[in-house]
């Protein structure tokens, strides 16, 4: 046992050394030491400071931030985007309200833009080559803000150039199952153009699926049944309501992965190795173009052929048919085809992240990162500027306290404004690739506030299970907007809730996919993360997102008139995010409850037993080791929780606090296995990787099982099921091991 004693001494020495580590690459100038005579190793959350911050977060300042941020289009790397870089630097270097330091990090990344001299187009062409109808290349200028040289034409970023022409078919949401259904209906898809609607699968997946079946071009539109509760008339839509107008077109990246396409797993520095852009995976294989539902109606309501299935029908005021081609007595001559002309260009551009830093007084080498992306497709008042407006207000209030000398956090706070998010989470991913080791070793948590306000009904929170407790604690102390007198927590539970076997009725915490800048932090680095926003009442609308998402109608006036007239919901998000930020950066013991993972694991286990268990037994694959691993994790998490409670009742020395906090911080990393999903770029988290199966359980196991169930699957497929089961069991055992006393194995 002598080696155990040596290990214990080494761990203690390492922890002592850790208390003295500074931020290194993210350090503030040495002349402005953060340490004061009042600094104590036992520094804890100061409730008076917390109350002061809550009181100073100002809705009117958030409003003015948003007006400034969204007054011009600011697509990534544009002159206005770079002007906002300087705005952020100026705010964070302000002598009265700024932070300790601020700087930019630049990356040379591959972006995709439409050709201003040769706009993309969609036409109906007759059998003799005559163009009978050309669809509008831009959205209608309804408020004077939808036109001008800086308003990008609607396009599918990273779709390849080309001018395919063919008979039109309707392919619903463009899933693999949708294209198989068309073939089941006897439709030959070879050489056709597919009209699809947003939803169901990712943007890029629609084109990838289409190409597999011989389709040569894809159109994508937003159906009013999916976004407008079926409303589509001009007097029912923007600018007369919050609904998407008929000419509105959702832009977006059609790249399948995240990060710079040419430098996967490497930061996109000028000197970095780059892939050949012509042989890079993840791009749409065929020309693709989004259109408005006004244009989609002209196409879809003139299609011939069999009626589409009931669940493929939408709200364009006609019966949707499958095609191919148009009705002979419709608006277009018999035999007419659709021509899709895409002239997108790939360009290497320099994109900037902006980081503002407050160095911690006690544990400067422990980071709480708060991030939001800066770039938009057009004005981006909601996405992302509502989040940037909140970020700037939180940093102003904390910066003011910092400059007055009345407060400095226990741990370091890093504010991040990410670049080029809309093209595939590029800025945040490049940052994690550049500082992978440092961030994995030192980051406590990542807070993401992308869109801060979808609407003004209730909080929507997503995150990994350990953040549930800190979000609940914060929201119980903050009043919800309006006159209800409820806390944000009590208002939230009215709209979305679940019954926990441990806590009873609680608000529902959603899971994190890969839809915003938390993706690389969760899936690549294994960092505890969350995403916070205010949203709408889903009992009153079925909209899949706020209706003007990624269009030229997402403007300041849209926010002020329809989403949050008094900006009280923006203020509520600022208070929630600010409270969570302070609790994570200032609390002596990290307010992360690892036992909340036990509920998730038990739920996954139960789903696997019920849906997969019988068939697995037939293949001589036992879930017994998984049952044991889940039980061991639950026991270890509960034991650590009891240990923390005991320490909180005493006067623990700094080493004890540091060791426990490191266990809480590092738990998420234990779920990483970079070889678990070799086909999935950047996905290493065995609990939160993409689950394409219908069973809500461990994703690798669910996906492998679904594939093994396919016709003609052989022993190799079931071997992969066994491998994925072993990966999960090993991860859970490793996670449990991180929670036991640090000198034990």
From Swiss-Prot:
Protein name: Aminopeptidase NAALADL1
Cofactor requirements of the protein: Zn(2+)
Residue sites binding Zn(2+) 2 per the record: 383, 422, 550
Pfam families, per the entry: PA (PF02225), Peptidase_M28 (PF04389), TFR_dimer (PF04253)
Record's bilayer topology term: Single-pass type II membrane protein
Changes after translation: N-glycosylated.
Subunit structure: Homodimer.
Active site location: 421 (proton donor/acceptor)
Binding site for Ca(2+): 263, 266, 430, 433
Entry's EC annotation: 3.4.11.-
Keywords annotated in UniProt: Aminopeptidase, Calcium, Cell membrane, Disulfide bond, Glycoprotein, Hydrolase, Membrane, Metal-binding, Metalloprotease, Protease, Signal-anchor, Transmembrane, Transmembrane helix, Zinc
InterPro entries in the record: PA_dom_sf, PA_domain, Peptidase_M28, Peptidase_M28B, TFR-like_dimer_dom, TFR-like_dimer_dom_sf
